[in-house]
């Protein structure tokens, strides 16, 4: 990202719904961890693992959230947009982002395995917060009955989403169903990273 872009707070503020003070703090954080104006997946992975422990699902979800254009790097605009999305999100602006985040391998479809991983990560995050963030995600243990219940929840949801029963949920299926059912939209968007987890970059908003 060039210096001209980093100074263009006006456009970024409008898109991210963050103010100048927020962006100034974010730019300092971005510069502290970026190399040549960008953050690569391995860089983000190290930050996430330091905070939460090793959890590939969380890393994939967060990286997909930040890497908006899919070029495998995160520039400051993407960094600010993702943070702004997390702190200012509404039901109407998260459906597309939810699909992008849940499509863990970026192949354009959500598989049953990916949906299970997303729901499992979400439940672990709930437990992480309940434990005052003292136990890393990869150290949290779930009882077999909890795992079974979580997988069943994910499988039931997958059956709803996989309209044409081809074993994958396309973006079209996802958006169509979420847009036609407020209850389903709320459920799907609740699986995104929770606001309480925003401190992995040291943010305090």
From Swiss-Prot:
Protein name (Swiss-Prot/TrEMBL): Recoverin family protein DDB_G0272130
Domain of life: Eukaryota
Lineage: Eukaryota, Amoebozoa, Evosea, Eumycetozoa, Dictyostelia
Transmembrane segments: none
Note: Probably binds two or three calcium ions.
Matching Pfam families: EF-hand_7, EF-hand_8
Similarity annotation: Belongs to the recoverin family.
Binding-site residues for Ca(2+) 2, renumbered to this chain: 103, 105, 107, 109, 114
Species of provenance: Dictyostelium discoideum (Social amoeba)
Residues the entry annotates as binding Ca(2+) 1: 67, 69, 71, 73, 78
UniProt cross-references to PANTHER family, sorted A to Z: CALCIUM BINDING PROTEINS (PTHR23055), NEUROCALCIN HOMOLOG (PTHR23055:SF178)
One Gene Ontology molecular-function label: calcium ion binding
Lipid-modified sites (N-myristoyl glycine): 2
GO cellular component: phagocytic vesicle
Keywords for this protein: Calcium, Lipoprotein, Metal-binding, Myristate, Repeat
Signal sequence residues: none
Domain EF-hand per the UniProt entry, residue ranges: 54-89, 90-125, 149-184
